[in-house]
Amino acid sequence: MAFARASHWRLRRLAGILGRGLGATAHAAPGAAALQGIEHVVVSYAENHSFDNLYGLFPGAEGIANATLQQRTQLGHDGKPLPELLLLGRDGKPDPAYPHLPNAPFRIDAAPVNRALSGIVPSPPHDFFHHQAQVNGGANNLFAAMSSVGGWTMGHYDGSAFKLWQWAREYTLADHFFQAAFGGSYLNHQWLICACTPRHA
């Protein structure tokens, strides 16, 4: 019950803020009339993938090509750059097929890895505390070290073959969208919808 009351209060407040903002925009912005043609807003929210994993090569997006060397380098538990990325299997051991990947983003669907777009790669842990450690105060440089899958966290696809890529070309791609909460999908679904954390009353 407390969750429902809090949600209604937040939604009313959000609607009021948006209403004022949209009202002001409708009178001031030159392209505001075009907004009246919008009947639906659909959000496609891809789970268990980073932006760069699917859209890092998307033309015009702030993706892999825009990353600095520091942003592209993963650190080990000792705080020093990893000498190479190890791709760990489901058993937690390095995959002998890929012994010496450089410490940098790499294509999953190209040599030397050559996994098919439809192939399954190990999913990194993304629970609340793991995620905080991986983000490392905003540096985002401990994903390989604080993971059961190692260097897979630095892999990405040429997503141009994905249907989602085509939709991004036709509609809108939010390359500066960031999840609201540490951890998995469910809590972030709640934040996407109501900007709140569910709780028991």
Language-model regions: role of each:
Residues 9-201:
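N-terminal pro-sequences and low-complexity stem/linker regions of secreted or lumenal proteins
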